[in-house]
Amino acid sequence: MKIFAQSKPLKATISNIAADKSISHRAVIFSLLSSGTNKIENFLFAEDTEHSLEIARKLGADIEIKEGIVFIDAPKKIVEPDCILECGNSGTSMRLFMGLLASVEGFFVLSGDEYLNERPMKRVGEPLCKVGAKIYGRLDGDKAPLCIQGGKLDFFKFKSKIASAQVKTALILAALNSQGCEYSEPELSRDHSEKMLKKMGADIEISGLNLKVKPLTKPLDPLEIFIPNDPSSAFYYAVAATIIPGSKIILKNMLLNKTRIEAYEVLRKMGANIKFTPKSEIYEQIGDIEISYAPLKAVEVSENISWLIDEAPALAIAFACAKGTSVLRNAKELRVKESDRIKVICEGLKCCGINVTELEDGFKITGGEAEPAIITPYGDHRIAMSFAILGLKCGMIIENSECIATSFPNFGKILKQIGANIED
């Protein structure tokens, strides 16, 4: 992908942002515990979520897609597949299915691509194994491929050392299908799972950072959901609007869950003009976000990191365009994403002539005039999209940009729609 420096403001109302990836995954996986037909509108059709759909099929789900709407009927009993369950680059697919399948009678093998198979899985596998799960993998169960000999698990209590929605959801799924659990985390991670499962009839008691999950006594009620648009995917355009003078972008039908808009709040602290307009709420609050240009100033960020971990690469681009030195800390989790994002962000910004210091748990970036560069994203969709946005300031070539399709196939199309000059 080649991006040319922008010579005019970006102005658009965008309604075709990618549907929320987190909720799309969960809608598919939770449907496997339901009875009846699940109806999922505005599903995200991207490589990551399609892996979850295909795994659900291999586990016995009847899946039909009509005019973009996904209909899922769960099997009466999850089927033991005769093949490997391929997760591609999707850590969400692998970790959530680990939790579900650890509590299901049968033998299952989960694997991913070269990048996913190097990401840590013990954070999910270890607590499950302590209560009777049988999960085997490379490096003592920390790396895929993973073999799971599923079965009913005992009641368990688990105090997580990290705020991770994937870990939390995996353990909730295992508990629902077994004897229940008590779960706590150090700070609130994304809470889509608790909200969706409670709406589907799960008995989950929420008290601050603590959950009590009771085992299912009957199948969950089927979902009927319209998935809102993804604020993480939309955030690239928000950053674009704040760094290109005169720009104004309106993002329609966005998920406004407070655990998902923290990065927008950081942009607001940096001086950006941002307005939220809530419109409706069923499973989650949905509304519009309006962003218009304003000069950005430096900021220090060290709290609620789990709420903006996916947006951190794009925030780094905002930091690079701000006046002063910005700092992100307590974000060590970035090192075990699709790439070592701390290292790759810092390498990329240095290539662009930006003064950046790599920290163990984040980075320090002094804003300045970025220079054109050729960026290698190391198979990481969020790195590729973030540097594409910086390219609007200075010009950029993103090598191997096809990785963007894992989460946001229409990214380039929408960039053109809002007035950017790019070549795929």
Swiss-Prot record:
List, in alphabetical order, the GO biological process terms annotated in this UniProt record.
amino acid biosynthetic process; aromatic amino acid family biosynthetic process; chorismate biosynthetic process
- Please provide one cellular component term from the Gene Ontology annotations of this protein: cytoplasm
Matching entries from SUPFAM superfamilies are given as: EPT/RTPC-like (SSF55205)
- Molecular function via GO: 3-phosphoshikimate 1-carboxyvinyltransferase activity
Q: What is the residue range of the signal peptide feature?
A: none
The record's function comment reads:
Catalyzes the transfer of the enolpyruvyl moiety of phosphoenolpyruvate (PEP) to the 5-hydroxyl of shikimate-3-phosphate (S3P) to produce enolpyruvyl shikimate-3-phosphate and inorganic phosphate.
The identity of this protein, by name, is 3-phosphoshikimate 1-carboxyvinyltransferase
